């Protein structure tokens, strides 16, 4: 099969607005020992793409510093964490049987080789990603999903959004019969949380607004709460016995509605990074605040099992060609959509 010598890609050479996304003709990367070369079938967009491009992650002790996910980025950088495609070449020491297989790439760069390793870097940030026709990845991080009934577009939506959601659900120890509250339910992670929590047998309450409410209900939420109305009042009506797990922001007003031993799992800062709450509601009720950055290798393996069996149905909000990456990111930033935005090289 093989690959050509050059490819189309979209890179950033500095932090800034959508205008720093530059189409380029670059050399196709060569898979090193232990790596594979993947022809990109689809790449999904994430808030991480916007924050990385803007340098919005801050640094310890300096929250306003321009920074990538885990520190300074090496420019120029090809963005894009979420890739589905086919293996077209393998590096030294890699089983040639992977060639031709349909795969999803785990974009995390881990702090170790164990099953519970933590992500300390991300494809598209700490190494080149999938805003391109081809991308390399460690062979240990590509998962064969040839048998999955999902399309490449759907598979590409899984790594960051569904990986983050599954990490939240696992770290929050959500079990069958419990009640989970999903805030920001119309986004990629929100829809993923709803679908995975439903598959787990939990009761799902979701917060959304306006025209998105119907789509969030269609995604599987048992009850959709209107952000424009009194949230605590709606929660008390929908779950008088309280909430077991909160997935997302809203801590101040929702913390008193957690059950004894309830868990609040945070995986982002879209609602702002400066949060105030009454710490007495935390310790008097044995509640927990849990930070959750993406997923572990174990979590990602569980996610790929769901994908092979087709037990989740990702929602595609829009599709763009690769050369419209700036427009695709602007669409993502407007937050008018439900589900995931994908690009097809």
Place the predicted regions along the sequence by residue.
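Glycine-rich beta-strand-centered segment in the early N-terminal region that forms part
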Residues: 27-44, 58-109, 148
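Glycine-rich phosphate-binding loop and adjacent beta-alpha segment
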Residues: 120, 249-315, 345
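Mid-domain Rossmann-like dinucleotide-binding core that forms the NAD(H)/NADP(H) cofactor-binding site
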Residues: 98, 150, 155-229
């Amino acid at each position: 099969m093989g690959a050509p010598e050059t490819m189309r890609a979209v890179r950033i050479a500095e932090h800034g607005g959508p205008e720093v996304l530059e189409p380029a003709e670059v050399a196709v990367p060569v898979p090193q020992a232990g790596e594979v070369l993947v022809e990109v079938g689809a790449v999904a967009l994430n808030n991480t793409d916007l924050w990385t491009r803007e340098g919005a992650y801050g640094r310890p002790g300096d929250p306003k510093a321009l920074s990538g996910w885990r520190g300074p980025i090496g420019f120029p950088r090809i963005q894009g964490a979420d890739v589905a495609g086919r293996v077209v070449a393998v590096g030294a020491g890699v089983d040639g049987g992977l060639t031709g297989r349909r795969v999803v790439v785990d974009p995390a760069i881990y702090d170790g080789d164990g099953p519970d390793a933590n992500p300390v870097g991300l494809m598209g940030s700490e190494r080149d990603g999938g805003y391109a026709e081809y991308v390399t990845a460690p062979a240990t991080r590509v998962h064969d999903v040839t048998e999955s009934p999902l399309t490449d577009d759907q598979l590409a939506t899984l790594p960051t959004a569904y990986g983050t959601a599954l990490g939240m659900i696992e770290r929050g120890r959500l079990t069958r019969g419990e009640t989970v509250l999903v805030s920001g339910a119309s986004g990629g992670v929100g829809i993923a949380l709803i679908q995975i929590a439903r598959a787990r047998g939990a009761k799902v309450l979701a917060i959304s607004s306006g025209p998105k409410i119907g789509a969030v209900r269609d995604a599987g939420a048992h009850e959709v709460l209107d952000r424009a109305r009194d949230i605590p009042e709606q929660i008390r009506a929908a779950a008088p016995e309280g909430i077991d797990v909160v997935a997302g922001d809203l801590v101040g007003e929702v913390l008193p509605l957690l059950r004894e031993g309830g868990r609040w799992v945070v995986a982002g800062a879209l609602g702002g990074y400066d949060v105030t709450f009454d710490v007495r509601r935390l310790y008097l009720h044995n509640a927990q605040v849990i930070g959750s950055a993406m997923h572990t290798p174990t979590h990602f393996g569980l996610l790929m099992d769901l994908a092979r069996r087709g037990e989740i149905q990702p929602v595609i909000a829009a599709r763009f060609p690769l050369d419209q990456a700036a427009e695709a990111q602007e669409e993502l930033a407007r937050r008018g959509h439900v589900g995931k935005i994908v690009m097809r090289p």
